Amino acid sequence: MTLEELKIRQLTNQYLLAPADKLTVMRDLCGVQAQFMTNALHSLKIRTNDYDEQTVAEGLVKNWSVRGTVHVFAESDLPLFIRCNNGADYRKNEWQGYSYMKNQRPCWALTPERQKYLADIIISAVAERAYTRDELKELCRANGMTKIEEDCMFESWGGGIRELCVRGFMNYTVQEKKQYIASPEFSPIPEEEAKFEIARRYFTNIAP
């Protein structure tokens, strides 16, 4: 196989020469990175044959995913990417032990009790409707959140908000603005099974 043939195969496998429907593309490519939504939507648009700006968000979610970054991916893949410590932490609003953000931030100021209290406020809110990040901040402030607690709960690398996302409580809405909505219920896939499936998709559609 020549170098040019390899290039063509790679472009085809990534749906750049042979577009497919939105959900097929999203599943096979393990979603698209969504640090900047404009780029994510462009990446999807050039690979799909059913792209529609009015309905593009249907069937998709936005959450923390591969490489510890925010991706847009198929809602049906929530169990694959949001594995919640092999399901042990799925919708678990208890923070006495290890948590990713707390153990990454030496200055973490939220006690387990206060984190649970603020999380309850946020979970109840997004169960009713979508809330922006600023709206959630105002809601928590109105319920007694201090500045130092806010710096943890809404920390720029995700904070307590991220922990609620990766424990299956909520997702970002699929748009540029930082807005959150309750996640549909799902059953996380066991860690090893999920990693195998992600690797299978990667080596089928992305890797050389």
Q: What does each model-identified segment do?
A:
Residues 1-151:
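Phosphate-backbone binding and catalysis cores of DNA-processing enzymes
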Residues 150-208:
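Loop-centered beta-sheet repeat module
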